[in-house]
Design a protein with these regions (language model features):
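Cationic, low-complexity basic patches in intrinsically disordered or flexible, solvent-exposed regions
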Residues: 7-10, 27, 31
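Cysteine-centered nucleophilic/redox motifs
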Residues: 98-124, 145, 240
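Secondary-structure boundary elements
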Residues: 33-97
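Extended, charged low-complexity segments
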Residues: 255-309
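Acidic low-complexity segments
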Residues: 28-53, 290-295, 299-307
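His-Asp-centered catalytic microenvironments across diverse enzyme cores
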Residues: 31-49, 64-70, 127-267, 273-274
Length: 309
């Protein structure tokens, strides 16, 4: 497997995944919505280029999305609803100036890619990042996408927090692929792949995935579990992440890390005002006025945790 995998027309097969799965849109009518406002989405991320379904378009919107729409988990941390309905996602992430976690981010991105004319398959992954050695295999709790561009499959993912991809990757194993940030690579594993990134010259795993297509209900189950399970870290820890052209911002409770030019600056946000300011400035969030949010920020500001990304 030393060459980029191709969609073989007309059968369109990738590692045994048939055309009805690989093409995406016919297989998943639930993800095609006339209620999606492409103009508003493109304005939100600051894209004014071509709307042709080309690799240049895909790379451009993939880079802009994580800079404009950050990863954040305020809703589950506050016990607020996390809806995956496209109208709710547009109200929150587009019109509302908020961010979200992987399901919100990649479902929104999926609708944008559909509207631009791309053929997309919905995938799921098991997270490996920061998992201690010998950790039991976790659930498929992360969403990513497979995008067909002129017969070539690309992995797209705008929702993986502090190490989010900022460029789609060819589904081509063993090759280090540059991004606007760190190099990434895919390694074959069992019937799927492991995604790794290079940190300080060392390759580290992020997640493993197969090409088995996912239905909207699959994401609803994982979304509900992460929102409600008492041991879900998203109910216990404030997390924020944003990838800008000049670096990465990562927030874990009251610890802010700024990764830029191969250096990392860390600082403690010692009160609720500093936390709110960072969320609004560093993470470009429009925060609601809420006594619950104010109380949570005050509580989190008294913690001390090291950011992992």
């Amino acid at each position: 497997m030393n060459e980029a995998l191709q969609f073989d027309e007309p059968t369109q097969t990738i590692l045994g995944v048939s055309s009805s799965h690989a093409s995406g849109r016919k297989f998943y009518p639930e993800f095609v919505s006339s209620k999606f406002d492409l103009d508003a989405y493109l304005a939100r991320i600051g894209y004014t280029g071509s709307r042709s379904a080309t690799i240049d378009t895909l790379e451009a919107v993939h880079a802009l999305h994580p800079a404009a729409i950050p990863f954040e988990n305020l809703n589950p941390l506050l016990g607020w609803l996390v809806s995956l309905d496209i109208e709710a996602l547009q109200a929150k992430l587009v019109a509302g100036g908020r961010g979200g976690w992987c399901f919100e981010q990649n479902i929104l991105f999926r609708h944008a890619l559909d509207a631009l004319g791309f053929s997309v398959t919905n995938l799921a992954a098991r997270v490996l990042w920061n998992a201690p050695a010998n950790t039991p295999t976790g659930a498929r709790s992360h969403m990513l996408l497979l995008v067909n561009v002129a017969g070539t499959p690309y992995v797209a993912d705008v929702g993986f927090g502090g190490n989010v991809l900022t460029r789609p990757l060819r589904l081509e194993p063993h090759i280090a692929q540059p991004t606007p940030h760190e190099p990434h690579r895919l390694l074959p594993l069992d019937n799927g792949f492991v995604l790794e990134f290079s940190a300080g010259g060392e390759w580290k795993p992020l997640y493993r995935f197969t090409l088995e297509p996912q239905f909207p209900a699959d994401y609803e189950v994982s979304n509900w579990y992460l929102c409600h399970h008492p041991r879900s870290m998203f109910r216990q820890t404030l997390i924020g992440a944003r990838a800008t052209p000049d670096g990465r911002y990562a927030l874990r409770d009251n610890m802010l890390a700024i990764h830029r030019n191969s250096k990392t600056e860390k600082r403690i946000l010692a009160d609720a005002a500093a936390l709110r300011s960072s969320l609004e400035v560093d993470f470009a969030l429009q925060l609601p006025e809420s006594p619950e949010l104010d109380a949570m920020l005050e509580r989190v500001s008294q913690k001390t945790s090291e950011p992992r990304a």
